[in-house]
Amino acid sequence: MKSKSYYVYVLRCEDGSFYTGYTTCLEKRLDSHRAGRGARYTQQHGVVRLVHSETFATRGEAMRRERQVKRLSHSEKEKLQSRQGNE
């Protein structure tokens, strides 16, 4: 049986802000954000693109990382975006 993966992701919104969340199915969650069925924040601010994602083995790990990323400053999230592009 395949083990479930958990993803922490960062989206860039139309107004330049970032949205951070976690999910078990990244593609499905991105589709729901883009279709306006995602979080209220992304419904109001629009989604431009996925700029960062990380994979975790447990829900707890993903939730801890999500909290860490949400606490990052805007410039620190910009660095995450830059680092993702260089990998």
Which residues does each predicted region cover?
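GIY-YIG nuclease catalytic motif and its immediate N-terminal context
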Residues: 1-56, 60-87
